[in-house]
From Swiss-Prot:
Keywords: c-di-GMP, Cell inner membrane, Cell membrane, Hydrolase, Membrane, Transmembrane, Transmembrane helix. It comes from Escherichia coli (strain K12). InterPro entries: CSS-motif_dom, Cyclic-di-GMP_PDE-like, EAL_dom, EAL_sf. Its EC number is 3.1.4.52. It is a multi-pass membrane protein. This is Probable cyclic di-GMP phosphodiesterase PdeB. The chain crosses the membrane at residues 6-26, 242-262. It is found in: Cell inner membrane. One of its GO terms (cellular component) is plasma membrane.
Length: 516
């Protein structure tokens, strides 16, 4: 993946690393409050169901105890027994004795009005009859839950079924409805119209209506359902509390993640990784600076110079990134890339012009490489060019240790490559050991060409090269005066802006065709 794409990806990850923990913390706060809200609603429904079962069980126990009583119906002793049972069982409001569903007496009155009980709304599995009735001996219009056997009926206040403290962080209301006709038996607050029907259509699901969340718990054995609800306003308050807990944690995690991603981003944007990426993606290309004969101005070859295009349209020269490649162990892959590019660009041209050559620079770190000689052999065979057409340029640094460099240079020369000594004269020992170097061509550094008029060393270099029968290439020729001086002093070849700057492949080929 290209560095710029990777940088874009990691920049996106950086943004996510900050926003995601914060967003996640807000989401978790909301989820925790909502989960807690629903759990408390469900828990309250279950507690109301337990209470309803407890009340119903107490009613059954009271009826069983009344059925065991023996004596004259509606006598003082009988009335006292019914009053005792009504008093003893806390949820029982009244006890009535009936005969053929007609009340005869109750714990409140010696004689009851002869109002016949209707058919029960529900008969439980264990035979108890259940009504929702407003019948009582006091004449008060108030619905009560009646449970009965053949001879007794106990009246239970419906509010007893939902008389449960929520123990929650917010107000929860509850209602009990009769399943037969959806009649509200009791409710702690008014319930919205239509909610009962909607809840019965989606059992087990929660419904939100006008900022209120409803839950239903059917109790088919009692023919009732429990509905609980609470306002979401309290949910929002709880959410704000949780945000203050989760948000700082999310910010801390986000900042730590951002610091980690920034370290990765800085590393990827480092010069080392940028150069490595450029090599792997073949972003580094080769330009070619013509080398001409000073005798007739015709081209004899070119020096291959690496160029690294930048995103702003500029180019980096080798002086900018070759030292970096040497420091970071990228010299070998960079050199291999340049060699491949030279043959891909110039292989056909060299085959068509066997008198031309391309010189390639080799740096110290790659002299011992086994991959470079092998690649040169493979490319030469593939493009069918003469090894002499690929010259290798080495600086005097590469010759600093003759014991190491001599066998390597000898191997390249035996393979047919001419060896250029580049930047000659810039080091402290160059003149002293020139005669011991096994090279073919001496390149006179641009600094000596620039100072022809006031440096005496240049003529000495030229004379030494002549003595050793070395051909010479002068670099950095920019004026006709320099060209004339060099030609008069016997320098064979030259390169510089007087002739052409380093050119991309297509431009170079056009220039070369005009100067053959």
């Amino acid at each position: 993946m290209r560095t710029r794409h990777l940088v874009g990806l990691i920049s996106g990850v950086l943004i996510l690393s900050v926003l995601l923990p914060v967003g996640l913390s807000i989401w978790l706060a909301h989820q925790q409050v909502e989960t807690s809200f629903i759990e408390e609603l469900d828990t309250y429904s279950s507690r109301v169901a337990i209470r309803a079962n407890k009340v119903a069980t107490q009613g059954k126990d009271a009826l069983q105890e009344l059925e065991r009583w023996q004596g004259a119906a509606c006598s003082e002793a009988h009335l006292m027994e019914m009053r005792r049972v009504s008093y003893s069982y806390r949820y029982i409001q009244e006890v009535a004795y009936i005969d053929n569903n007609v009340p005869q007496c109750s714990s409140l009155e010696h004689e009851s009005p002869p109002d016949t009980f209707p058919e029960p709304g529900k008969i439980s599995k264990d035979g108890y009859r259940v009504w929702l009735t407003s019948h009582n001996d006091l004449g008060i219009i108030r619905y009560m839950v009646a449970m009965g056997t053949a001879h007794y009926v106990v009246m239970i206040d419906p509010a007893s079924f939902i008389d449960v403290i929520p123990y929650s962080s917010w107000q929860i209301d509850a209602a009990i409805i009769g399943n037969a006709h959806n009649v509200v038996i009791t409710s702690s607050d008014e319930i919205a119209q239509g909610i009962i029907t909607r809840l019965q259509k989606t059992p087990g699901e929660h419904i939100e209506n006008n900022g209120i969340i409803y839950d239903i718990l059917p109790l088919p054995e009692m023919n009732i359902s429990i509905i609980t609800w609470a306002s979401t306003k309290m949910l929002q308050k709880g959410w704000h509390r949780q945000v203050f807990i989760w948000l700082p944690l999310g910010l801390v995690i986000g900042l730590l993640a951002a610091m980690f991603v920034l370290r990765i981003l800085r590393r990827i944007q480092s010069p080392h990784h940028r150069l490595q990426d450029a090599i792997e993606n073949r972003d580094i290309c080769v330009h070619y600076q013509p080398i001409v004969s000073l005798a007739n101005g015709k081209i004899v070859g070119a020096e291959a110079l690496a160029r690294w295009p930048q995103t702003d349209g500029s180019w980096l020269s080798p002086d900018s990134f070759i030292p970096l490649a040497q420091q970071t162990g990228l010299s070998e892959p960079l050199t291999l890339l340049i060699i491949r590019s030279v043959f891909e660009d110039m292989g056909d041209w060299l085959r068509q012009h066997p008198q031309q050559h391309i010189s390639i620079n080799l740096e110290s770190p790659v002299l011992t490489s086994e991959k470079i000689p092998q690649l040169l052999r493979d490319m030469i065979n593939h493009y069918q060019v003469n090894p002499r057409q690929i010259a290798l340029e080495l600086t005097e640094r590469e010759f600093a240790d003759p014991k190491t460099s001599a066998p390597i240079i000898s191997r390249y020369r035996e393979a047919g490559h001419e060896i250029y000594l580049d930047d000659f004269g810039t080091g402290y020992s160059s003149l002293s050991y020139l005669q011991d170097l096994d090279v073919d061509i001496l390149k006179i550094d641009k600094s000596f060409v620039d100072a022809l008029e006031y440096k005496n060393v240049t003529p000495h270099i030229i004379e030494m090269a002549k003595t050793l029968k070395l051909k010479m290439v002068a670099e950095g020729i920019e004026t006709s005066k320099q060209e004339e001086w060099l030609r008069q002093h016997g320098v064979h070849y030259g390169q510089g802006w007087l002739y052409s700057k380093a050119l991309p492949k297509e431009d170079f080929l056009r220039w070369a065709e005009q100067h053959l």
